[in-house]
Amino acid sequence: MSDNVIEVREVQKRYGTFTAVDGISFDVKRGELFGLLGPNGAGKTSTIRMIYGFSPLSGGSLRVFGHDITTGWRDVRARLGVCHQEDSLDEEMSVRDNLEIFAGFFGIPRAVARDRANRLLEFFGLENREKASVRELSGGMMRRLAIARALINEPDLLILDEPTTGLDPQTRHQLWEKLARLKNQGVTIILTTHYMEEAAQLCDRLIIVDHGKILVEGRPRDLVAQFVGKQIIESSPVCEGLRRFVTERGLEHEDLGHRMLIYCKDDENIYHEITKTYCQDNCILRMGTLEDVFLKLTGRELRE
Amino acid sequence: MSQSAPQLSWRLLRVWRRDWLVTRKSWLIGFMTPLLEPILYITSLGFGFRILIPEIQYEGHTLTYVVFMAPAIIATNIMYTAFMENSFSSFVRMYYQKTYDAIRATPLSVDEIIAGEIMWGATKSLMAATIMATVLSLFGLVRYPTGLGLLPLAFLGGLLFGAIGMLFTAFVKSIDMFNLPIFLLITPMYLFSGTFFPLENLPNWAQSVAWALPLTHLVSLARNLCLGTVSWMNVLVSGGYLLAATMLLVPLALRLMRRRLIQ
Ligand SMILES: Nc1ncnc2c1ncn2[C@@H]1O[C@H](COP(=O)(O)OP(=O)(O)OP(=O)(O)O)[C@@H](O)[C@H]1O
Ligand SMILES: [Mg+2]
């Protein structure tokens, strides 16, 4: 078997006449933490749903653990865990029962399920709330429980659709640390997120999709270097002199009206030149980020 | 995942088990309703109508009103229990709690989830009927051994009315829309299926309509099992009707739910 846990080939997803995923191809390697980024409605959830056989493909082919998902979905699902974008915890049950009863769907014996539930409750810091009903949990606890539940079958592949949306920074950082530990244990992880900082920190590799198509694929740092450079000059407000200077020098830039981004690649002298001559106070030199890449590639208009 | 043939296996029992474990937590409510309902009916209708309807003619037998009506309490409860479970409750699990979505990340097919849910609805009907039959037995209103036939009847009726509930779950956009089938289908059946008066009292055309409805057959069998007057003809016709309708509507419910859920 190849080293790829997921192989996506020319996959399409249509809802009626609307094409949500438009022929995308990518691989996720064993042990990798792979990111799926894109604006709202880009087709991330649609893609993820096809990966675990929730949603049938409209075209192309998709293999997970070497199985064709269309025919081998049962074997595939036995070895993966999913944390949905929308909460799908069982509100009628306690925290512990959510884990133990879910284990039943995988046919895990009860004693084993109890054992694993103990470990997962501890791993996610929920052991004191095990008897609480899901309704009593905070958003962060619910999300932790949802991820814990996705791990009850000790999956080789963990699929997380926006696992950190709506969480406070503390919980988010704690989750990153848990994900890093899972990755160290050899779990392959694919995740979607709207937090670019998160993607930059966590992902070994990522793709940015828009309108159902892949725009770029690569390592976060490489993408930053390739598309925006290590450093960016940001000026706000923008004076006319600066506008002229940038055009004359033919610098790659983005003029947002009240704000201007100048991609100076690795040329630090430009910054000194600008601050000496033009707006001293309104100009900063900062690191290029994945967010810059994202906005540059997907544009700044609102979606949906 | 496939759109055509149902994908069923014993895994559907895992869904059944989930429902059982969740329901077990509130067992007292589940236990009290079928315990008290027959007592309420018997005291209210039984004593209330005792003077108005001293006795009633049913298929050549002369019965007191309580003896006539008691089996219908079980039959209508079988209908309501499974229908409610696979309409309102299943809809809540599907739509609000996303329970089905969660289970669809495990090695279970949509067919198994829905079949497990219908099986659970039937199990609830069976449990309620068992409790009700026990209570009615204490009042001497169930004859044995034929009364034991109520148990398989409850399960079969539960499958059928659960499937009917699930058919509507496959269509409704919001939970309020279940009031429509209740008003147009369930309540008329409750009133006109030989439940509270013998069908012979109805004009011929209305009798024919009544015999087309599943509850009429469920009531007829339940009554004859309780009275000890059940005939093979009865079992063949009404049992055959219920079985055929179940074998038709359960696969139809699976198919329509697949269409709703698999997108
Ligand atoms: N079941 C469906 N029926 C019809 N259209 C759908 C369905 N599911 C998704 N879509 C549409 O497909 C497109 C992609 O949706 P998808 O949920 O995959 O986006 P996403 O990238 O996950 O977005 P978000 O970041 O908002 O979660 C959207 O335009 C959405 O409206
Ligand atoms: Mg999404």
Identify the function of each model-found stretch:
Chain B
Residues 1-144, 152-263:
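Hydrophobic transmembrane alpha-helices and immediately adjacent juxtamembrane helices
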